[in-house]
Amino acid sequence: MVNFTVEQIREIMGKPHNIRNMSVIAHVDHGKSTLTDSLVCKAGIIASKAAGDARFTDTRADEQERCITIKSTGISLFFEHDLEDGKGRQPFLINLIDSPGHVDFSSEVTAALRVTDGALVVVDAVDGVCIQTETVLRQALNERIRPVLHVNKVDRALLELQWEAEDIYQNFTRVIENVNVIISTYSDELMGDVQVFPEKGTVSFGSGLHGWAFTIEKFARIYAKKFGVEKSKMMQRLWGDNFFNPETKKFTKTQEPGSKRAFCQFIMEPICQLFSSIMNGDKAKYEKMLVNLGVELKGDDKALVDKPLLKKVMQLWLSAGDTLLEMIVTHLPSPAAAQKYRVENLYEGPQDDETAKGIRNCDPDAPLCMFVSKMVPTSDKGRFYAFGRVFSGTVATGQKVRIQGPRYVPGGKEDLNIKNIQRTVLMMGRYVEQIPDVPAGNTVGLVGIDQYLLKSGTITTSETAHNIASMKYSVSPVVRVAVRPKDNKELPKLVEGLKKLSKSDPLVVCSKEETGEHIIAGCGELHVEICLQDLQQEYAQIEIVASDPIVSYRETVVNLSNQTCLSKSPNKHNRLYMTAEPLPDGLTDDIEEGKVSPRDDPKERSNLLHDKYGFDKNAAMKIWCFGPETTGPNIMVDVTTGIQYLTEIKDHCNSAFQWATKEGILCEEDMRGIRFNLLDVTLHADAIHRGAGQITPTCRRVMYAAALTASPRLLEPMFLVEISAPQEVVGGIYATLNQRRGHVFHEEPKSGTPQVEIKAYLPVADSFKFTTVLRAATSGKAFPQCVFDHWELINGDPLEKGSKTEELVKAIRRRKNIKEEIPALDNYLDKL
């Protein structure tokens, strides 16, 4: 146990090589928060007794009740360790960020990852790698974050499932292999090989609930002394196909009669024997073992029996805190090392300006550059700490800084505030400590700048500094709810509350429809539910009436327009000719993932479009814009030749395109995956007759006409559902999915367990209350996990009278208070 003073912490903060910024990531319920307790307990912020039950990082009342982590919290830990590099024992400061595993909160995970350099990936030994593990690990690797693995809940394998040592070994190898497959798929050459290997010490095994864990390195240290070999040699032997023959006392690569796998014999068997002797109450046997292991029980602990005794003994022998902190300190990078290869991903500006150099060297004397990844609510309602990480320079109380929002461009005035920082604070889970200043490489909370930032942003002192790239979220908000106050007089309170809500959660989108409705969009039912609850109790503190959840749709086309569409301007002097066609498969997703974007070099982009998607080279060079919001998955291509004055109307056409793609023709939803071709333009010679007022509405009309003639269709969002359940309830799962238009595309039994893993696609529109219904159908044995996966075409032509799709379109139009009928083509198409 260590009791800190702020001065001591501040002293280590100045040594970037002794800092580790890391987060704990895992699938929901794989025991992340419980494990974090062992770490916090070791670093001396909770009293030792509470570990395993305290769930220290779950700071909100609803997290404690629901037993899930919703917001990610940061805690600083202190640990002394000898890295065996000749410098002796050194103090380390570990900034730990516990992040949620539930998929609806994966925006929180993204925010947590941006400010860390390493990740502890937790996987349940019995359940293995699940969908959320994969999603989060993929996000981590995209951010160039180095992983280490902890295989958790080994106590289940020993006590519930009573596995033998060899079964456990086979199971461990399978889990590690699955993790490494994901790592090698998504990793980056610049980081080198980041796969995890037990024999290199980057994998630990243990139980968060019982508070014990071990790495191969830990046992290798013990046996290396005993056998008189080097530790590194011993580590190689204790894993993989190395067998020990007790008669000849030799290690072999192949299994001979009488020899056993070294991992099983030297590591798993002693643990299994200790478990069984304690659980069977064989006192003579386990007391002798404890003497050999050097574990001494003191005072009250001597009277313990059964599980409490087991927990105590394992904690004393293989303390989880020590093992994990050792692994973190030894195998995760310090900011000084990590920022060298992360700077390209993080910094938007040129890689050789003073800020980029400061980040690369993690230099406390360079100009300040800090990224605020999220807003943390303070104890007084409605104010927030800006939580983030200093990448370069030093941030101090009272310092005058430039607060740059995500839309800031160097040299511009938009989204820029110059203000003083009132206080800098250390975030300690439930507590906050004041600190005078914080140098590069550390995480920090700032007071007094929350009103100038919406969700995230960059804080600098250099006038030339660019932004740190804003975060890419892996989930898109597809579930929306309209909210209104129960008493209309309280509308202003609701509006204020919505502003605070959108600050506190990186992924919520709060908007106001033209009808005056206030909409909250989230990425799943649970997410929206928590947001509404926050809004009602915390931010607005009024009674709220929420509508049923509404699903966002997208509009697209499936053919090339069957005619060239023409629209004339209101003064009849200008004509625009256009067609629409679908974008090639895969390009839409590439645009959404940012692989093809308006910021790319036009030459490189046109080569990619030509080689991969068969675009015409000339057309690919003449893409005018992407939309909606200038980055969306629709493009406008200029295929005209030799038109006078064309450049003058380009901006007007672009704004018409943004407008048209934001509110599609069928039911004013966003368009997706459409390519508009501008074929020909006839313009009036006088500039005064071809201004924005003439061109913009005309261009929008011709786009609507082009979309209507190209077989318009609706797209609906689909969830990927992953369900693990026992074999006997599979029938109930299929029945529930079939009632809701879901279809199963993958089912496999999990080896070594009675569980079956099922993956299915389920339309978001039919996913509400799915969890509740599924639990009822399977008597609570099936656990679904939904994550937005893709947009699926709805079969059926919305223009066909009486079709189901037409009904759907009408329903959406009714909800939006616009005329029910889809406007006729004649409204948009003009004759010559």
Swiss-Prot record:
Keywords for this protein: Cytoplasm, Elongation factor, GTP-binding, Hydrolase, Nucleotide-binding, Phosphoprotein, Protein biosynthesis
Enzyme class at the top of the EC tree: hydrolase
Region named Disordered: 580-608
Binding site residues for GTP: 26-33, 152-155, 207-209
Biased composition (Basic and acidic residues): 593-608
Catalytic activity: GTP + H2O = GDP + phosphate + H(+)
Keyword Calcium on entry: no
Subcellular location: Cytoplasm
Transmembrane segments: none
EC number: 3.6.5.-
Pfam families, sorted: EFG_C, EFG_III, EFG_IV, GTP_EFTU, GTP_EFTU_D2
UniProt GO molecular function: GTP binding; GTPase activity; ribosome binding; translation elongation factor activity
Diphthamide modifications at: H689
PANTHER family: EUKARYOTIC TRANSLATION ELONGATION FACTOR 2, TRANSLATION ELONGATION FACTOR-RELATED
Purpose: Catalyzes the GTP-dependent ribosomal translocation step during translation elongation. During this step, the ribosome changes from the pre-translocational (PRE) to the post-translocational (POST) state as the newly formed A-site-bound peptidyl-tRNA and P-site-bound deacylated tRNA move to the P and E sites, respectively. Catalyzes the coordinated movement of the two tRNA molecules, the mRNA and conformational changes in the ribosome.
Family, per entry: Belongs to the TRAFAC class translation factor GTPase superfamily. Classic translation factor GTPase family. EF-G/EF-2 subfamily.
The protein, known as: Elongation factor 2
